[in-house]
Amino acid sequence: MYKILISFLFGVMIFANVNAQSVSGILQDASDKTPLSGATIKLSKSDATLNPFITVSNSHGSFTFRNVPEGNYALTVTSVGYASFKKDIQITGKNSNLGDISISKSAETLATVTINSATNVRQKNDTLEYAASQYKLNPDATGEDLIKKMPGVTVDKSGAVTAQGETVQKVTVDGRDFFGDDATATLRNLPSEVIDKIQVFDKLSDQAQLTGFDDGNTTKSINIVTKADMRTGNFGRVFAGYGTDDRYSAGGNVSFFNNARRISLIGLTNNVNQQNFSSQDLLGVTSSGNRGGGGRRGGGGGGGGNFRGGGGGNNFSVGQQSGIAKTNAFGINYSDAWGKKIDVSGSYFFNNSNTSNDQTINRQNFITKDSSQYYDENSISNNQNYNNRVNFRLDYKIDSNNSILITTGLNFQNNNSTNLVSGVNSLNQQNLLSQTEYDINSNNKGYSFNNEILFRHAFPKRGRSVSLGFNTNFNNRNGENFLNAQNIYYKSATVITDTTQQLSDQKNNTNRYSFNLVYTEPVGKRAQLQINYNPSFQKSSADQETFNYDNTASKYSLLDTSLSNKFDNTYNTQNTGITYRLGDRNNMISAGLSYQYSELKSDQVFPQVTYINNSYSNILANAFARLKLSSKSNLRVIYRSSVNPPSVTQLQNVINNSNQLFYTTGNPDLQQQYTNNIITRYTYTNSAKSQSIFANLYFSTINNYVSNATYTASKDSALSSSVILHKGSQLSKPVNLNGYISARSFFTFGMPLKFIKSNLNWNAGVSYAKLPGLLNNISNISNSYNYNLGAVLSSNISEYVDFTLSYSANINDVKNTIQPLLNNNYFTQSAGITTNFLTKKGLFFQNDISNQSYKGLTDGFNQDYWLWNMAIGQKFLKNQMGELKLSVFDLLKQNKSITRDVTESYVQDVRNHVLQQYFMLTFTYKLKTFGKGRVSSEGRENRRFEGRDGQPFGGPGRFPL
């Protein structure tokens, strides 16, 4: 069947109509005859019997429409800063070359008139667009500072961006990658003064952009559209500061823009938890905690403060990091257009961090209906981490209907860590059950390699296309863990002490290959059919060898078979499906079904040989509806089902004895999960009043949800020949359970307050999570409810007066079926004000004051504290390019970091060591040189629509949506 389908598709390619008429031309500036790139060209049939052809001029000003039927047409050209151009043309039975078309600047541009009628936000199809000019900021503000003022967009203290209730995973600049997928690096290193627009949208996968069909691989994304007159020039800043307690911070960023060619450099070194980038954790070792006391999920609140200065070192962010870090980082980003057909971008990034932390944990473990156990832990840790990552993307447009896209990512990580832990297990926080003291020294390294090769072809017939993608993913992790532990167990009449001294050698590998063949065919004037075939092949291995210390030989040479395991796993899928779509640019619905056959094979080759082979047949559905309710509002509804296999570490049946009060193991009998997701989005934008409303609903269920089964020993039990589960100790393993539900809502309303020249954003939400679990073979359901409300008032006065007031409150209600009378309600609230006042002579004064309050946590964790950061400085040198700033962090010496984590088996409160008061003197020098830009702002913003409305697939092969 598949061979027939492939033969049919390539047969259609060969015998496609090759005699279609084309219309081409070259746009140029009427005054200096330079190419006009990024302009929007529309070709409309005079009798309106066809949907219009739309494309965008390339960097050489040229454009082409293919397969244009004979008839009379109107050619329209629009571009920001230029007068509209319209010309009537007649298409006969041959190709038409319109030659050079001169476009004159608009009268407003020639007279240098500033137009102030722009609106804060507007909806453009599936894209929400904010006008940067409508948000007044200080001259040294970054892209992150800008988006914080926009309704529906939030940035937490660690730099994570949320838009319309979803985490932003990618930020591009003029449609081009900037440091790969590192949204933090883009927003914190790009000055706000070069930004013209911020576009928020759901980015389809590269393959789905050809067809417009959502394949489930969408990511919430932001595209930054730069100002046309700032696309040729150099800009950036360098800074260096030194303070009390030997605190230091130095670094900078510089960008060289020459239209399509762009080179950016960033560098950073400090010991004040400043991180202007995101760090990838391939090894799973740099996140907080998880030393064996059980995995931790969720958590919120707390923080190390957030202080935004006015100079080059203005990213004073500590955020949710655990501990105090010394950081060194360097990165380079390159993007360019190699001729007319090749767009390329690439980046290299290195970072090294040395993090020290002192952590306290207070945990309540649910045991039975009437009893709980309590675990208290103190730990000291040091973590040295090294990351190298390379990203590369090449888009080769063979012609207007064919392209090849190559995307590559390579990441390396090396991590060395030391953890010293002291833990006590008790009954009712009085009667001691056991205690442990252990240290773990770990040396881990790994790499990941991801590569995608995608061929896309748009046929002359609009709506007919074919694409073939090939993906490879390689992941490798190796590590050595040295454990020294002493455990004490309190029995009724005796005290038992044991010691452990061992080395664990771990190796994990995963290789995955996948293909994706997609064919689309128009059905009538408004409908389209998609057929896809997607096989994938994944092979994983996990080897763990544990050696006890041999005192006689003075080395780790005694193999412990109870703690050693060699495990292989394969997961292969065959997926084929069909989707039907009907609609136009305003309204569209689609529905599809696919059949997936999956095989999950697990082979244990040591210490015993076992084989498990599972196969699954699933029907997966998808549906989408986009409705334009009015000129100001629209509604989108998305449904998709999917299946996901368990990881090889979840499957491997080997005991982890790092914390011998809490053992964990894998489960080779795990099944794949089946997930249903529904997303509803309502958007209302009133451009005339600059008002906006966003309301989102998310709902998901999971069958065979991978949860945890936790067993607390009521008496000593043997897990193996060398592992004893003592009374009061726990063993946890993953199991499949039904009943998982997650639901959440997000609402925000933005409006201007003209009488104080400010913007007010209200937000509210409700979330619910149902987590099933097993406690001593008894079902326990954790029901978590969260209610949140917040408001942000941000100034929009001038660059000399910038302030933001914010407030947020969270009420959390957690109930467990095993202990329904247990009160786990807690409340957190945060209020803050930031001010930045600047005089025309360069004197500035800044404040960042916040209050954090926690109620309902365990004793010692209920806190109410203030974090006050302040700075005063003077700008000097020509054009105020230099700056000297004196700042203080945590003026009141009250900074803290507190989180609460809730799972199906326990609730815990965590306190981490944080950065506290220091003073710093910082010098900053600003770089800024701009030439004449030649790229239209309005045109380049359409770059991200490649495969939708713009080049190269905006021609005959595209379905007009």
Descriptions of predicted regions:
Residues H60-S62, T76, A83, Q90, ...:
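Membrane-proximal, glycine/serine-rich, low-complexity loop/turn segments characteristic
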Residues D47-L50, N72, T76-D88:
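A short, solvent-exposed loop/turn motif at the edges and junctions
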Residues Q528-S633, N812-D813, L822:
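Signature of Gram-negative outer-membrane beta-barrel scaffolds
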Residues S46-S62:
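Short, acidic Ser/Thr/Gly-rich low-complexity loop/linker segments typical of extracellular
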Residues N378, R512-S514, L558-N565, T665, ...:
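Outer membrane beta-barrel strand-and-loop segments of large Gram-negative receptors
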Residues T211-G212, F277-L282, N357-Q373, N382, ...:
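Outer-membrane beta-barrel translocator domains and adjoining extracellular loop/strand segments
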Residues I26-L36:
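Structural motif
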